[in-house]
Design a protein with these regions (language model features):
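TRNA-recognition modules of translation machinery and tRNA-sensing kinases, especially anticodon-binding
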Residues: 1-216
Length: 216
C-alpha cells in the first residue's frame, strides 16, 4: 500500500478488496473497480462492482447497471443466465459422502460414476439427468420449499424473468473457489462474445458482500 493505493499481483479483485477493507474498514456500501489481473500467466483487464452489507435490491440494481454497461459500451447483451447456490451441495449430499472423488464426479457431471457411488435414485443423480433449464423445478422435489437456497434461487429467477431473461439454467455442480463464498452465484453469458461471462456471487468472510466482475 502506497499513498492510499493498493499495489499487488492479483488474479481477483474481490479477494484483494476483502483483505484491504478487513484491515481498513470503510463506510462505503458499494465500490467500483477496474484494473489488471494475472491469470494463466497473462494480464487482462477486469471491471467490477462490490456491494458490502448487500441488500437484494442493491445487488440487483448493480446487475442492471452492469448490463447497461455491456449493452452501451460493449455493444453486446446477455444471452442466457446460470444460477447456483453454494449451500445446495450440503442440502443434497450428506457430509460423509462429500469425498474428493465424489465431488470431482459432481463437478464433471459424471453420471455413470455417481450412479455407482450414490445410486440411481440419489437426488443429485436425478437432478443432473435433467436439462439444466428444468433442474430448478426438479430441485423442489428434493429439498424443503423453505430452504434458504431454494427461496433465494426462486426470487432471482422471478426477478430475471421481469427483466426479460427467460433462458435460465441451474448449476448444482459448482464448488466455491474460496471458503468465504457461501451463497448464491450468477453467470451472465454474452450473446455475441461467447468467451465473456459476467460473474457474481455472495461471500461472507471478515466482511459480507456480493461481487460482480467481468474480465475484458
Amino acid at each position: 500500500i502506497y499513498e492510499h493505493q493498493i499495489y499487488a499481483l492479483r488474479n481477483d479483485f474481490t479477494d484483494q478488496l476483502l483483505r484491504y477493507y478487513s484491515m481498513y474498514p470503510t463506510a462505503a456500501t458499494k465500490v467500483a473497480y477496474t484494473g489488471l489481473i494475472i491469470r494463466n500467466n497473462e494480464a487482462a483487464v477486469q471491471v467490477g462492482l462490490e456491494n458490502y452489507a448487500p441488500s437484494l435490491a442493491n445487488v440487483q440494481q448493480s446487475l442492471k447497471l452492469f448490463i447497461q454497461f455491456i449493452q452501451q459500451q460493449l455493444r453486446d447483451n446477455v444471452h442466457f443466465v446460470v444460477l447456483g447456490h453454494y449451500q445446495l451441495l450440503d442440502a443434497l449430499l450428506d457430509k460423509s459422502l462429500q469425498t474428493p472423488d465424489i465431488l470431482s464426479m459432481i463437478e464433471e457431471r459424471n453420471l455413470s460414476g455417481l450412479v455407482t457411488y450414490l445410486s440411481t435414485e440419489h437426488p443429485i443423480v436425478q437432478i443432473l439427468k435433467e436439462n439444466t433449464q428444468q433442474q430448478l423445478n426438479v430441485l423442489e422435489h428434493y429439498i424443503p420449499n423453505d430452504h434458504p437456497a431454494l427461496v433465494e434461487l426462486k426470487i432471482w429467477k422471478r426477478w430475471l424473468h421481469t427483466q426479460g431473461y427467460k433462458d435460465i439454467h441451474l448449476d448444482i455442480t459448482a464448488q466455491p473457489p474460496r471458503s468465504y463464498y457461501t451463497g448464491l452465484f450468477i453467470q451472465c453469458h454474452f450473446a455475441e462474445n461467447e468467451s465473456r461471462v459476467l460473474t457474481g456471487g455472495y461471500y461472507k468472510g471478515s466482511i459480507e458482500g456480493f461481487g460482480l466482475g467481468l474480465t475484458l
